[in-house]
A protein has these predicted regions:
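Acidic, His- and aromatic-enriched active-site or binding-groove loops in soluble protein domains
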Residues: 87-105, 212-223
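Short acidic loop-to-helix transition motifs that present clustered carboxylates
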Residues: 75-79, 323-326, 507-514
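C-terminal, non-catalytic macromolecule-binding modules
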Residues: 268, 439-468
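TRNA-binding/sensing appendages of the translation machinery
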Residues: 1-98, 161-200, 299-300
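Extended, low-hydrophobicity, polar/charged segments
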Residues: 54, 111-119, 144-160, 165-441, ...
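C-terminal structured "cap/appendage" subdomains that terminate the fold
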Residues: 493-552, 556-559
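Generic long, charged, amphipathic alpha-helical segments
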Residues: 461-515
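Charged, low-complexity intrinsically disordered tails and linkers
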Residues: 1-28, 113-145, 258-263, 459
Length: 567
């Protein structure tokens, strides 16, 4: 292709609205343009990269026996109502009505629709197992779209679904996807980690996320350098570090003391000259319309994901100030578990074994000393705290680290959540009706591109891996008016094409510096510069990564790039 014929609208400055590196460079390099909040047009270069990513995904999905389909993005409400997710998805789902006032939605994922297809067609164990997939546009009504292609309202996703007769079959399908995802992300040139994850609204018994460490990410991954343990922050477990000072010994009786105007854990710690870890934190939640008291160590945070997993199907929220006042007779900041009999109390495991701690007295401006779980109040104990950097690994005792990350893929063992609720049945070998077991597996196509840019860039632009760059090589004559340079450049370009390289000839009538800056900006892995060294039969080969430059013979230029690019 000739650059002079292409639409590549590069920018010299970072757009003001772009905060993360990938967003800045995608705009500056002319890959994307914003239509509305969270909605982008993919221009020529972006489309080339995204198609390459999709091709890699297709090849690896086909290799595990998955069959590509294409399902409707416009879904009737009743299908989502069957699974119960019409209400669960809330404001995240785009909803609309047709001219007959029937409810519809734009699909965010396709578990329900795939199950409908299976329900209508699968009859016998002889038709299983099945793996079906699609690469399709999805829609999610994000409250605050941001970070370019990382949090959008319209996006491309590869979603696949497995149907098996039993748990062993699901385990095999899950393992196939796990390995296929590793091959996909390896081929795309990403550095990633597969971590244990929470299934959330998807449901199911097990899931893994594939994460790329990046400050642009909105997820957090907990890792242990000692044993390799890794998990999403929502799922991670740990041993908290010991309290900052030992608890007072003895069987002491709770006693109130005046804490005027001290409402926060930090304020009480300063007032008492005791560390936050010597206090109990009281949180009031409303679960299915009823109050619940949650107790944590003062320096710990509640994991709402863990609480939700413990609560099961209960819907919960934080209590409002007026509700707290009605139930406790005091305001938040003065609450505690002693004397509470009218609601369930849940305590985090970190409070087990602790003695004589400080808690609210359920009286404004007062707290209690000497509060002990199991003696002064009873509670149901669970792992409810959010892991923090510096905690200890439960497997090996090493210190845990927490890193912001970008989620690029997620796989789930769904179990029977959808097949059971939506009435999918087949006959087994004995002629008995049984319910198939399902898995669900997703990859964010644009997220792969954004993650690659976050990983690989410098002050001059993107440094894209060859497998997903829009072009493998750009051939750049330094002086368009030099006939010898143009002839050699066209010859090298033609040889690159013949070797199967995606080549671009920069035939624009621009200064060499402009051409070089644009090539660096858009992330082409190799540049062949045809300049003054042509008189000696040589051209410059510049590798975008590290800017390493070597002189090669004109006749060897195309073959050298092909060898380095793995063609």
């Amino acid at each position: 292709m000739l650059w002079s014929h292409l639409f590549i609208p590069t920018l010299r400055e970072n757009p003001a609205e772009a905060e993360v590196i990938s967003h800045q460079l995608l705009l500056r390099a002319g890959y994307i343009r914003q239509l509305s909040a969270g909605i982008y047009s993919y221009l020529f270069l972006a489309q080339r990269s995204l198609l390459k990513i999709q091709q890699i995904v297709r090849q690896e999905m086909n290799a595990i026996g998955a069959q590509e389909m294409f399902l409707p993005a416009l879904n009737p409400a009743e299908v989502w109502q069957e699974s119960g997710r019409w209400d669960i998805m809330g404001d995240n789902m785009f909803r609309l009505k047709d001219r007959f006032q029937r409810d519809l939605c734009l699909g965010m994922t396709h578990e329900e629709i795939m199950t409908v297809v299976a329900r209508g067609e699968l009859r016998s164990y002889k038709q299983l197992p099945q793996i079906w997939y699609q690469i399709q546009t999805k829609f999610r009504d994000e409250a605050r779209p941001k970070s370019g292609l990382l949090r959008v309202r319209q996006f491309l996703m590869k979603d696949s679904y497995s149907f098996d007769m039993d748990q062993a079959g699901l385990d095999a399908a899950y393992e196939k996807h796990y390995k296929a995802y590793c091959r996909i992300f390896d081929r795309c040139g990403l550095r990633y980690t597969a971590v244990e994850a929470h299934s959330g609204a998807m449901g199911g018994s097990q899931s893994h996320e594939f994460m790329v460490a990046s400050d642009a990410g909105e997820d957090f991954v907990v890792t242990c350098a000692g044993c390799g343990y890794s998990a999403n922050l929502e799922k991670a477990v740990s041993r908290p570090v010991a309290p900052d000072r030992p608890d007072p010994e003895g069987d002491l009786t709770p006693e109130p003391f005046h804490t005027p105007g001290r409402k926060t854990i930090a304020e009480v710690a300063e007032f008492t000259a005791l560390p936050e870890s010597s206090q109990m934190k009281s949180l009031v939640l409303v679960a299915d319309g009823k109050p619940v008291l949650v107790m944590l160590r003062g320096d710990h945070q509640l994991s709402e994901t863990k609480f939700g997993a413990m609560a099961g199907d209960m819907e919960f929220r934080q209590a409002h100030p007026e509700e707290i006042r009605t139930w406790f007779g005091a305001d938040a900041g003065s609450l505690g578990p002693v004397g509470i009999k009218n609601m369930p109390i849940y305590a985090d495991r970190a409070l087990e074994g602790r003695r004589n701690m400080i808690a609210g007295a359920n009286r404004n401006d007062y707290h209690l000393r000497n509060v002990t779980l199991g003696e002064d109040f009873e509670a149901e104990v669970h792992d409810l705290r959010q892991v923090a950097a510096g905690d200890l690994c439960t497997r090996c005792g090493s210190t845990l680290a927490v890193q912001k990350s970008i989620e690029i893929g997620h796989i789930f063992k769904l179990g029977y959540k959808y097949s059971e609720s939506m009435g999918l049945r087949v006959l087994n070998a004995e002629g008995k009706e049984v319910t198939p077991i399902m898995g669900s597996y997703g990859i964010g196509i644009e997220r792969i591109l954004s993650a690659a840019i976050e990983l690989y860039h410098d002050k001059d632009g993107m440094i894209l891996p060859s497998a997903i760059a829009p072009f493998d090589v750009v051939v750049t004559p330094a002086n368009n008016s030099d006939e010898a340079q143009m002839t050699a450049a066209r010859r090298i370009y033609d040889e690159c094409i013949a070797l199967g390289l995606d080549a671009l000839l920069d035939d624009r009538d621009e200064r060499p510096g402009v051409k070089f800056k644009d090539a660096d900006l858009i992330g082409i892995p190799y540049r062949i510069t045809v300049g003054k060294k042509l008189a000696g039969g040589m051209v410059e080969l510049v590798e975008r990564k590290g800017k390493a430059t070597v002189d090669v013979l004109v006749a060897e230029a195309a073959r050298t790039v092909a060898a380095r690019a793995g063609r």
